[in-house]
Amino acid sequence: MRLRKLLIFIPAAVILLFFLLTDLLSDLFWYASVGYSPVFLTILITSAALFVIGTLLFFAFSYGNVILAARTGAGAFGVEKEIQYLGGIACAVAAGITGLSLSSSWEIILAFLDQTPFHISDPVFGLDISFYIFSLPFYTILIQYLLALFVFTLIISSVMYAAHRAGVRIDEYGVFQYIPGPFPFGLSWKDTVGRFLPQVNCLLFLIFTTLAAFLWLTRYSTLYTSKGTVIGAGYTDVTITIPALTILTVIAFLIGLLFLLNEKIKRSEMIAYGIGGFFIIAILSAGAGFLVQTLIVEPNEFNLERTYLGYNINSTLDGYNLANINARDFPVLYNLTETDIRNNNATISNIRLWDWRPMKTTLEQLQLFRTYYTFNDVDVDRYWLDGNYKQVHISAREMNSYNLPQQAQTWVNRHLVFTHGYGAVMSPVDRITTNGLPEFFVKDIPPSSPFPSLSLDHPQIYYGEGDIPYCITNTRTEEFDYPSGDENIYSLYDGNAGVELSLLPRLVYAIQLGSVELLVSGSLTPDSKLHLYRNILERTSKIAPFLTYDSDPYVVMSDGKLSWIIDAYTTSDRYPYSEPVRTGELSAKSMNYVRNSVKVIVDAYTGDIRYYIVDPDDPVIQTYAKMFPGLFRPVDDIPDDLRSHLRYPHGLFNIQAEIYGIYHMTDPRVFYNREDAWVIPDEIYRKTQQRFEPYYVIMKLPGEEREEFILMLPFTPRNKQNLIGWMAVRCDPDRYGEMIVYQFSKQELTYGPMQIEARIDQDTDISQSITLWSQAGSSVVRGNTLIIPVEQSLLYVEPLYLEATQKGTLPQLQRVIVSYGDKLTMQPTLNEALQVIFGGRQARQDITKRVEQPGDDQSSSILGQISGLYKQAQQALSSGSLGEYQQFVDRIGTLVSGY
């Protein structure tokens, strides 16, 4: 009979087990399809081993004590099995929870086992930094596990003993009963408690010994915590807190020994004295620390904290890889000539006139062609084209099947037909048409380009930045490839990517994805391929979750295909004496150590992922490489053309610049007083004041012979608007990652971005032009202020865009403002502005320079005509009539130039 009952439950158990294994099987299939099964298996086996070991050890120890406590409490009366079973269930649940928690620490365990030394010692304990990064987290996890085990065991054992001692029973109906009266067989409370005390003493010994270990480790954590002026252990920590923790460690261990030896020495009062002394010293040390900090340190803070401030400065520079910055003086000379401008043509011709935000809006109007396409981002890169080094904007045209009409939102369309984006758009950052629109190096569908090196053999984009649902290829349904006039072109995927949908994978993914269509669709064949995790950030973090990924991947055209490059970082929040930062640009977590050690390259067509180590000196990435052999490749394995497109990450540079603005003050006294603090300045974008953003430029650094691709950012003194310096990092392969800081003279005024913005606002002609354009129904967008070093001078360039206030706007580059020294001009093009400043040419008469005072009949008439033509132009644009739109724009131009 019992066997029949068991047989009834076997199918249900099998089904339940299959559902539990679905996630595991789906991951196994996917990792095998991308070629990273060893990574997955390493994580899986380590997690499973930790879970099993942690659970079994916890259960065996706690349940063993439960059995012992039950027998002790029951005496000769006998153990109540049901009560003991309840204790076993409690132990099993606690063991499972603890084991599950321990299994999530697989990265800490593996890093501890494979750790790489930094060969740098902390200044207080003299330990290698690797102890804090790799060993201390492991010891902390171990202590937390043991403390949870021993405390839980003490509690559950005490409950088990008390339940048996009190005569609690469970009847045949599962109801608790209490048997009152004296304990049977003549045993008193004192007798049974005496039998239970040895077990309690042993557990308390283990608890206090573990507590002693915890207090000992806490001493090390003072080196990366923040209190007061110093990041890390300061004077009070070194003289009071750390010695006090050492004393408390010894006392806690001695208390544990007293518990262990209590049966022999029979001196319970000594335990009481020990525990009392422990709390007294803990309270006194906290009070002493407060008094020392308040009465001794704060009145003489710099002298007492000077040494520790030095530790803080040096460690922070090390933590953010800023210790080897090359600082140079940059005396600003306003002696540029027209010849200098011509000699720096590569710099001038790559000044970014198009900001990525209006560029994105313009691309959406001119190059999407269909509502289901999208440009998720506009990236900045550089290419060698016909012997010229050109900075460009590039954006991938991705598929967004969520934008299909509602009636077309079918499973077949979203997962079998509209599977991929198509091509990319590339535009030089400096060129505009006569209509104020960008020129294109690559455009349209299919992509066309005058440069053979930019041709694409596989323009299809199956993997990108967007929220991309899974798709299935190699089906009986053709995939939409691209629109061609009134027709659509269809294709079939010819790559090897994806999970083969044989019977078992179809069943597994149907359950995981909640898609019955995977089982019943007649379009699928055994050769069909399922493409999962098509968002490239999700895809890369699925394989290597221990890295931190930059939120701004960028697309590259190389070797006839599209590839994505993603910056990946190793981070830690345990670098001694390094100041922590919390930023959403890299990670929501706090960190005080970061290295851009890895570049990830993802093929947009196949989804193939490669991880390349670009900073082999980073001990953290060396540790990960040992944890996962075969995952990482050396940087030299990157194809040369792709390697030429590596760039220094914008987000990391922003963090480093912010840190360097404070920590360039390496003199502890200057640092303490913040006498020379630098900040990242503000600028005006549109009509809003915002923080200045780092920007990529192609330029010739002072003293260098050729132009190169760099990322740069200016600094201003805190609470001032003038420039104090600028920071640059090289991006070209031969000198990648080299940082230089150029410092301006503190005795001479060098205009900062907000001072240039103020000069623009105060210029009557420019202000009148902006007012006029705004009155004509347009919105004036003030672009980023770019500070361009040329020779030993600075050029300031700010583009102005016009866009309609209606929906479907098409931003146009209307004017370029250039400032040099005391000169300021606004002209239709950059070249004209430079000719006005350096060539002695008379400035073109802007429309506002001819505007009469309010009430002038001629002004009112022309303004009315311009306003009317502008409204008609916007109506034509909204209806998609670009030809009519251009005619109206030309008529406006005629009125402006003739007035």
Swiss-Prot record:
Gene Ontology CC terms, in alphabetical order: extracellular region; plasma membrane
Compartment list: Cell membrane
- Could you tell me which InterPro entries the record lists for this protein? UPF0182
Which keywords appear in this protein's UniProt record, sorted alphabetically? Cell membrane, Membrane, Transmembrane, Transmembrane helix
Kindly list the residue ranges recorded as spanning the membrane: 6-26, 39-59, 93-113, 136-156, 196-216, 240-260, 271-291
User: What Pfam family does this protein match (any one)?
Assistant: UPF0182
- Would the keyword Isomerase be found if you checked this record's keyword annotation? no
Principal cellular location given in the protein's record: membrane
What protein is this chain from? UPF0182 protein Mhun_1303
User: Which species is listed as the source?
Assistant: Methanospirillum hungatei JF-1 (strain ATCC 27890 / DSM 864 / NBRC 100397 / JF-1)
